[in-house]
A protein has these predicted regions:
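Alpha-helical transmembrane segments
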Residues: 11-15
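C-terminal motif of bacterial Sec signal peptides marking the signal peptidase cleavage site
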Residues: 16-20
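Bacterial N-terminal signal peptides that target proteins for export
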Residues: 1-8
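Beta-rich interaction/scaffold domains
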Residues: 21-135
Length: 135
């Protein structure tokens, strides 16, 4: 009886492994490539080294023009910020955010590319930062 269960388990495992990998391939980052062509940013935030937001109000995201306008508090250290993106399902971001990012060069705004789940659609977003004037 144990022999039958082991054989059945082995057969089920082989079937599961061989059929599971055929539907959606995996990209170079280990993420599934899907059929989704949607490609947009749904939310954006900047946090300081204390992981608290530095933005004033909501970020204005224009998914047609591919721009993000955000106002940060006066005195914010623009050289040490963590950008936080919320993307549509299955999309990914380039370059990858690996830690603190320098946003201090306001004349040359940072750009990030959102890539759809299908990897067929790419949109490059420009982040414009305005520093709130001191009161």
């Amino acid at each position: 009886m144990k022999k039958i269960f082991r054989l059945l388990f082995c057969c089920m495992t082989v079937i599961a492994v061989t059929t599971a990998c055929d539907d959606n391939p995996i990209d170079e980052d280990g993420l599934l490539i899907t059929d989704r062509d949607e490609c947009y940013v749904s939310n954006f935030d900047l946090t300081g080294t204390d992981h608290l937001t530095v933005k004033i109000g909501d970020a204005i995201i224009d998914n047609e023009a591919c721009t993000i306008n955000i106002t940060v508090a006066s005195g914010t250290d623009l050289q040490h910020l963590y950008p936080k993106f919320s993307l549509v399902t299955d999309a990914k971001l380039e370059p990858k955010i690996t830690g603190i990012t320098d946003f201090s060069d306001l004349a040359n705004p940072r750009r990030y590319t959102v890539i759809s789940g299908s990897r067929r659609v790419r949109k490059t977003y420009t982040i414009y930062i305005t520093v709130q004037k001191p009161v």
